[in-house]
Amino acid sequence: MSQLVYFSSSSENTQRFIERLGLPAVRIPLNERERIQVDEPYILIVPSYGGGGTAGAVPRQVIRFLNDEHNRVLLRGVIASGNRNFGEAYGRAGDVIARKCGVPWLYRFELMGTQSDIENVRKGVTEFWQRQP
């Protein structure tokens, strides 16, 4: 199975989701000066920012990571977290990344996710990679 790449802010909601998920994952550093480069196809798990608008929905660190063409071409799908309080903008970062990078928006979950979200993502990620050539 290929990997998951994720970003988690200092709130650590996405980090806690990843820990509960129990699948191999690489974290995009919080410190913007630190960089990572992936070497295999991956699914990106990302929180949504911006208080409900499109501008600022994708964290700067994730933008910088995806601006590296090597990282961008290996992206196969995106999963977004968010807050339902933002209505239609719930999980907006997933929509923005999927559209701009031409990959499927696979799932969204609220804050650090529920047990049902964990099970759905674990199953969905496994099935997604099984369908890939």
Curated annotation (Swiss-Prot):
GO BP term, pick one: protein modification process
Gene Ontology molecular function terms on file: FMN binding
A Pfam family recorded for this sequence: Flavodoxin_NdrI
Record family assignment: Belongs to the NrdI family.
Functional note: Probably involved in ribonucleotide reductase function.
PANTHER family named among the record's database cross-references: PROTEIN NRDI (PTHR37297:SF1)
Descriptive protein name: Protein NrdI
The organism's taxonomic lineage, starting at the top: Bacteria, Pseudomonadati, Pseudomonadota, Gammaproteobacteria, Enterobacterales
